[in-house]
Amino acid sequence: MTPHINAKIGDFYPQCLLCGDPLRVSYIAKKFLQDAKEITNVRNMLGFSGKYKGKGISLMGHGMGIASCTIYVTELIKTYQVKELLRIGTCGAISPKVGLKDIIMAMGASTDSKTNRVRFLNHDLSATPDFELSLRAYQTAKRLGIDLKVGNVFSSDFFYSFETHAFDLMVQYNHLAIEMEAAGLYATAMELNAKALCLCSVSDHLITKEALSPKERVESFDNMIILALEMMTQ
């Protein structure tokens, strides 16, 4: 048990899917897992373990932003011995290379947060995912007929009042979308010798102002959930 997770030691499988929204975690458990069991609920940040096609998998919410995500990822790795962490979330696209419903694999994560500079003694940390997980995601997407978009994301501490004038520069440096956690997830996994990857479904486009309806968001997210479960239980 930790200050933020009240699961017992052994309740988490080595493979864990992460979502910012704990209700999305509950949705995945109920719709996609067999024998799903709630294992933690501190602060209503839900976690579950269950089976997908007979193989064990865990789910955990992490809240919004790098600070919150880092807390849960640290405790999952250090206390519960989770070895592979896959964040599945939504993002706002900024690149013309991607559109609504596309799934992005974040091969690098820039950020306006100071957390990685603090942990890396004020140097620039290359926040990148695990290669084996990335390869597995890419190969699984190919098998499922999913056109996975690969590029960088920008993990911002700001949901509102973001520096929109910087979008053109980000696109120039092959940043496909804005989200809020990948840079912290990758850095924490690197520090603690775990494997991590972030997949994001495009729910809206910050340049064209297009956005999915609530129904379309669920449908597009389901495709990413299936991809995530398939690759994490191989």
UniProtKB/Swiss-Prot annotation:
InterPro entries: DeoD-type, Nucleoside_phosphorylase_CS, Nucleoside_phosphorylase_d, Nucleoside_phosphorylase_sf. Its EC number is 2.4.2.1. Keywords: Glycosyltransferase, Transferase. The active site is at D204. It is an enzyme of class 2 (transferase). The keyword Glycosyltransferase applies. Gene3D superfamilies: Nucleoside phosphorylase domain (3.40.50.1580). Pfam families: PNP_UDP_1 (PF01048). A purine D-ribonucleoside binds at H4, E179, M180, E181, S203, D204. GO terms for cellular component: cytosol. The keyword Transmembrane helix does not apply. The record marks R217 as: Important for catalytic activity. GO terms for molecular function: purine-nucleoside phosphorylase activity. It comes from the Bacteria. SUPFAM superfamilies: Purine and uridine phosphorylases. It catalyses: a purine D-ribonucleoside + phosphate = a purine nucleobase + alpha-D-ribose 1-phosphate; a purine 2'-deoxy-D-ribonucleoside + phosphate = a purine nucleobase + 2-deoxy-alpha-D-ribose 1-phosphate. GO terms for biological process: purine nucleoside catabolic process. PROSITE patterns: PNP_UDP_1. Phosphate binds at G20, R24, R43, R87, I88, G89, T90. Homohexamer; trimer of homodimers. NCBIfam families: deoD, PRK05819.1. Catalyzes the reversible phosphorolytic breakdown of the N-glycosidic bond in the beta-(deoxy)ribonucleoside molecules, with the formation of the corresponding free purine bases and pentose-1-phosphate. PANTHER family: FI09636P-RELATED, URIDINE PHOSPHORYLASE. Belongs to the PNP/UDP phosphorylase family. This is Purine nucleoside phosphorylase DeoD-type.
